[in-house]
Amino acid sequence: MSQSGSRLFTSESVTEGHPDKICDAISDSILDALLTDDPRARVAVETLVTTGQVHVAGEVTTSAYADIPKIVRDTVLEIGYDSSAKGFDGNSCGVNVAIGAQSPEIAQGVDHSHEVRTGELSDDEIDRQGAGDQGLMFGFATTDTPELMPLPIALAHRLSRRLTEVRKSGVLPYLRPDGKTQVTIEYDGDKAVRLDTVVISTQHAADIDLDNLLTPDLREKVLGSVLAEIDMPELDVSDIRLLVNPTGKFVLGGPMGDAGLTGRKIIVDTYGGMARHGGGAFSGKDPSKVDRSAAYAMRWVAKNAVAAGLADRIEVQVAYAIGKAAPVGLFVETFGTEKTDPARIQQAITETFDLRPGAIIRDLDLLRPIYAQTAAYGHFGRTDIDLPWESIDRAEKLRAAAGL
């Protein structure tokens, strides 16, 4: 149901140099390397980083070969960690690899779905593939922004991307890779009306003046640059509270400051807390894992539903049983913004989208090395890269199915 009255909503993002995001990037870079030579590779790779060390573990079944230590070092160096003075050095860090094969008990349910094994469905390629696990996945879309994402997370990601851009391009050469952003938006009912607070915490070189150098630079080169790019004239940006490194100096960062793990930024990866989350992480998982592929499909469904004018704000949930091809549940929430009966919207979604795992992989062309680019700055609503689940190619068909 839509809400009325003024309220504040906050979302955060992190840069690619955040310890958890280093891990996501390593896991997805390994995945991409394996998918390049073996599109049917089964991959579940987890990474841990800490002071001077990278540990890679998981389960992989593939005919491909990947030089994992080299991928680890190249990824760390590309992010910008090339010196112990920055908290990590991809040239000299220790790399430990512990990879096993996927459980054959899991594989049998993915390779031969419950429906095929019981004779419930025919043995074609789509029917044959069962879900790689049980679970529930959510998708969300809203008219907040042109890319149909919640504004707080959209702005937070843009700020994090810009923070990395000015560091890597040399505009602000004293910045270091680790950083976080946070955006608080005032809503009047369901409409974003004012940018209230921006927090930017960024690692930097020693002896940088916070008040006279860092804060003015970030206000102009990061916040000012991002605000100049967004096309939202109705958003009040006249009185923004900017908080830069509120704890003071931030020299000790990266894995030297905090250990990092794959899959620990799932709210940053999705909708910034404005939508529910099923709990499954994305990075390091091939698309047979519905944690990833079905969450992408649900974003595709939700975005097409809003683009079709079925609702201004929509959240969709799908659920699976391990080894079964067909979803066990579909739920649609329109928050009182629907333009037709929600039951009709749900039926239109069912008619327009095939949510069996094999069909999702086919329709979104997911057996490709496209995942490392998603490891930082969000998996949804990206304006800087082209992702198949951001397409609104089913909007007209969905609108017709809903009778609009």
UniProtKB/Swiss-Prot annotation:
L-methionine binds at E59, Q102, D258, K289. InterPro entries: ADOMET_SYNTHASE_CS, S-AdoMet_synt_C, S-AdoMet_synt_central, S-AdoMet_synt_N, S-AdoMet_synthetase, S-AdoMet_synthetase_sfam. ATP binds at H18, D178, G179, K180, K249, F250, D258, R264, K265, A281, K285. It is found in: Cytoplasm. GO terms for molecular function: ATP binding; magnesium ion binding; methionine adenosyltransferase activity. It catalyses: L-methionine + ATP + H2O = S-adenosyl-L-methionine + phosphate + diphosphate. It comes from the Bacteria. Binds 2 divalent ions per subunit. Its EC number is 2.5.1.6. GO terms for biological process: one-carbon metabolic process; S-adenosylmethionine biosynthetic process. Mg(2+) binds at D20. K(+) binds at E46. Keywords: ATP-binding, Cytoplasm, Magnesium, Metal-binding, Nucleotide-binding, One-carbon metabolism, Potassium, Transferase. GO terms for cellular component: cytoplasm. Catalyzes the formation of S-adenosylmethionine (AdoMet) from methionine and ATP. The overall synthetic reaction is composed of two sequential steps, AdoMet formation and the subsequent tripolyphosphate hydrolysis which occurs prior to release of AdoMet from the enzyme. Belongs to the AdoMet synthase family. PANTHER family: S-ADENOSYLMETHIONINE SYNTHETASE. Homotetramer; dimer of dimers. This is S-adenosylmethionine synthase. It comes from Rhodococcus jostii (strain RHA1). The gene is metK.
